[in-house]
């Protein structure tokens, strides 16, 4: 008789656990509703903002700035005063 009593209390717990697992299955449908509003909001802001600022700004500043300063500067200032100073000494 003692062995039968031990088996009885072991069977009801599993049934209770199964019912608890079925309950959380109903609320999940509400979760998929949240990611739907966040998805269309993120891609709409960074897409038109990134390509419009760095594209026309980077190629227009470094191109005309680099060749205009280093070219005429070292060819007229460094060679002239450097030779005169060495001859005087």
UniProtKB/Swiss-Prot annotation:
Q: Where are the sequence repeats?
A: 3-14, 18-29, 31-38, 39-46, 47-54, 55-62, 63-70, 71-78
Q: Where is the composition biased (Polar residues)?
A: 75-89
| Induction (free text) | During squamous differentiation of epidermal keratinocytes.
Main location group:
cytoplasm
Keywords of this protein's UniProt record, alphabetized?
Answer: Acetylation, Cytoplasm, Keratinization, Repeat
Please name the Pfam families in this protein's record. Answer: Cornifin
- Tell me, which GO biological process terms does this entry list? keratinization
A Gene Ontology cellular component where this protein is annotated is: cytoplasm
Q: Which residues carry this modification: N-acetylserine?
A: 2
From the UniProt entry, list the residue stretches annotated as the region 6 X 8 AA approximate tandem repeats.
31-78
Q: Where is this region: Disordered?
A: 1-29, 68-89
Specify whether Transmembrane is a keyword of the entry.
Answer: no
What does UniProt give as the signal peptide span?
A: none
What family is this?
Belongs to the cornifin (SPRR) family.
Q: What does this protein do?
A: Cross-linked envelope protein of keratinocytes. It is a keratinocyte protein that first appears in the cell cytosol, but ultimately becomes cross-linked to membrane proteins by transglutaminase. All that results in the formation of an insoluble envelope beneath the plasma membrane.
Tell me what this protein is called. Answer: Cornifin
* Organism name: Macaca mulatta
Traced from the root, the source organism's taxonomic lineage reads: Eukaryota, Metazoa, Chordata, Craniata, Vertebrata
Tell me the gene name.
SPRR1
